[in-house]
Amino acid sequence: MNNILSEEVLNVTDFTTSRQLTLWKREDLQSPQLDDVAEEVPVALVYNGISHVVMMASPKDLTHFAMGFSLSEGIIDSPREIYGMDVVPSCNGLEVQIDLSSRRFMGLKARRRALAGRTGCGVCGVEQLNDIGKPVQPLPFSQTFNLGNLDRALKHLNDFQPTGKLTGCTHAAAWVMPSGELAGGHEDVGRHVALDKLLGRRATEGEEWRQGAALVSSRASYEMVQKSAMCGVEILFAVSAATTLAVDVAERCNLTLVGFCKPGRATIYTHPQRLIAD
């Protein structure tokens, strides 16, 4: 199989389609013209030949997505438990064919669920309400972050949204180093998928990705908190608000959750002791 870190595509226009549409401005209905629209395709994650989940996603960075999903859903504990991946066309979408260790595959089969997700929806397909939420080990308090450095990260977050700049239709997730510099980031039409891509990337990067925090351009849902905690992320910044369930989950698993992140301000929901106000 191909190396799990291989890039599927390089050109941002591979993720957009030109469609004819009509723009409206007050007192000015313009003639039809071409504009860029973000691609959204079904992506199936296939473990050892068995399809486990279908998510709607942007068709790029899919090996990172598969790695992040596998980690954040507890399918694996380590990237070493995935031996390889291939991204291949399938029907009306794409498949990520994943070579999973035998031990992990047996565990996956024991708790397999059939998911036909909406855009990055992680609850779709869960059979019972009791199945929502996974046990997460409480996080340690090993990280700190100076809020004075957050402005720098916010300023450059959209650098990782080239498709979003063309279409206005993607979410971003980026890794913020303690200095406020962004180590890297990913975009997707689904906010959960964007975060999974980031978590998958982080799992295979070097030491500079161990310190810092995750930053997302969207609101913070309970699942984004849970995914972050499952991957050992202690601090999650969100540009928009957090839900009540997200706050409850963050409190229980010792994750520092911060929303409404804007230059010079933020709302700290849980565990402020990791944050330095400078």
Curated annotation (Swiss-Prot):
Gene3D superfamilies: 3.10.20.10, Cytidine Deaminase, domain 2
GO cellular component: cytoplasm
Primary location class: cytoplasm
One Pfam family, short name: FdhD-NarQ
GO molecular function term, any single one: sulfur carrier activity
Active site residues per record: 121 (cysteine persulfide intermediate)
Keywords: Cytoplasm, Molybdenum cofactor biosynthesis
GO biological process: one example: Mo-molybdopterin cofactor biosynthetic process
Chain sites annotated for binding Mo-bis(molybdopterin guanine dinucleotide): 260-265
UniProt record similarity statement: Belongs to the FdhD family.
Purpose: Required for formate dehydrogenase (FDH) activity. Acts as a sulfur carrier protein that transfers sulfur from IscS to the molybdenum cofactor prior to its insertion into FDH.
Protein name in UniProt: Sulfur carrier protein FdhD
Organism the protein comes from: Salmonella agona (strain SL483)
